A protein has these predicted regions:
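Divalent-metal-activated hydrolytic enzyme cores
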Residues: 1-15, 26-127
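Conserved functional hotspot residues or short segments at active or partner-binding sites
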Residues: 19
Length: 127
């Protein structure tokens, strides 16, 4: 996935990369459920998803958010988006250079399934 962003930004001059998550994300909810009540014979594909999402959402289980399922999922969605943005900003020498030298902007946003509104909570792209 990082390679796709590197290719688009390096080859075609793309200057905005948006990590777009969405409200009520099933993958986030499934990860939180798996962390709370692990299943013994989890599918390898589900295990892969949980392993990718776990680092960004697991710390939330130790907060008061853990008592409110809806709030927990909402915060976990944004935490996962932030983690993905951070991975793009700091996990690739190519992207780091493009950010520093060529103005590549990598931001996180959340699409609301109920309203259709996209919230650029992690930085609004400038016109």
């Amino acid at each position: 996935q990082v390679g796709s962003v590197e290719f688009a930004a390096g080859r075609f001059g793309t200057r905005l990369a948006v990590v777009l998550g969405h409200t009520q994300c099933g993958a986030i909810a499934a990860t939180l459920e798996e962390l709370r009540q692990p299943t013994p014979h989890q599918s390898p594909n589900l295990h892969s998803i949980v392993d990718r999402i776990r680092p960004s959402v697991e710390p939330l289980l130790a907060t008061p958010l853990a008592q409110d399922a809806d709030a927990l999922v909402a915060h976990a969605v944004r935490a996962n988006i932030r983690a993905a943005v951070d991975h793009l900003r700091h996990g690739s020498a190519v992207l780091e250079r493009l950010v520093a030298e060529e103005g590549l902007l990598i931001v996180g946003a959340e699409y609301c399934l109920e309203t259709g509104v996209v919230d650029f909570f992690d930085g609004v792209p400038e016109a």
